[in-house]
Amino acid sequence: MCPTLNNIVSSLQRNGIFINSLIAALTIGGQQLFSSSTFSCPCQVGKNFYYGSAFLVIPALILLVAGFALRSQMWTITGEYCCSCAPPYRRISPLECKLACLRFFSITGRAVIAPLTWLAVTLLTGTYYECAASEFASVDHYPMFDNVSASKREEILAGFPCCRSAPSDVILVRDEIALLHRYQSQMLGWILITLATIAALVSCCVAKCCSPLTSLQHCYWTSHLQNERELFEQAAEQHSRLLMMHRIKKLFGFIPGSEDVKHIRIPSCQDWKDISVPTLLCMGDDLQGHYSFLGNRVDEDNEEDRSRGIELKP
């Protein structure tokens, strides 16, 4: 990928409006595809409500959970600030708590975009609501239902979403009820959009007012977090690879990929036993804890390597 394209992709990734719009567009497309391919109202008493409500609410809940779960910052906050198993020596300053709350509100704002978009689109479409509310429609003012029992009335109403061929008077009632439900559903959709917009505006204002950072400081802090994550991942990958090459060479006597292997080491039975049980990463009071399966065995002959580092020879 050329540097110019890399810069464009990087700038788009940091543009919150673009990311939010992309999430909303993908949610709308997914909802339309999902609705056209999977939704089919059962048109039975007692099932319409649960079926329509499930298609309306459950995907929104799944999108909400996924919105939190797919954000790496969410797991960072959970592990560093919320986990009760965190090391006792880790002290958190008030400023750090405020910044963590600010990050959490930012994550929440991004996570609720997809479920709110799903709810708004489904309500504006009205298909799920029409199925769920069909058997609860009020038809007392229609003469054709005067001599119909309550159970029969519910059965007729439940079949309206699937009714294709029927007497003209029934079709007239069905169309009027469908328009009423469509009206109610779309009104709820617009109310949801209005409330979500107001809530987003108020939340942004409150976050800016309560933030310990100025506008420029927040911009710098956001860039700092992104660069910190990118550079750490790059350095960690290179560091772990070099460290593992060093330990593999100690265990087997050569490095994978070497063209002129003149000497190999045969691991003993004790070597295999020692590297079969993994150790945890720097847990407890031992800040110089081992990092991998190979850490127990191959470094025990030189404990000073951890403090002074490892010399990498060509």
From Swiss-Prot:
Tell me the superkingdom of the source: Eukaryota
Tell whether Transmembrane is among the UniProt keywords.
yes
InterPro entries linked: CALHM
Tissue expression remark:
Placenta.
GO MF term set: monoatomic cation channel activity
Transmembrane spans: 15-37, 49-71, 104-129, 184-207
Pfam families xref list? Ca_hom_mod
Disulfide feature = 41-131, 43-162
**BP GO annotations:** ATP export
Q: What residue ranges lie in the Cytoplasmic compartment?
A: 1-14, 72-103, 208-314
* Assembly with partners or alone: Oligomerizes to form decameric and undecameric channels. Two hemichannels can assemble in a tail-to-tail manner to form a gap junction.
Name the family: Belongs to the CALHM family.
Record's function text: May assemble to form gap junction channel-like structures involved in intercellular communication. Channel gating and ion conductance are likely regulated by membrane lipids rather than by membrane depolarization or extracellular calcium levels.
Q: What is this protein called?
A: Calcium homeostasis modulator protein 4
What species is given as this protein's source? Homo sapiens (Human)
Lineage here is: Eukaryota, Metazoa, Chordata, Craniata, Vertebrata
> Which gene codes for it?
CALHM4
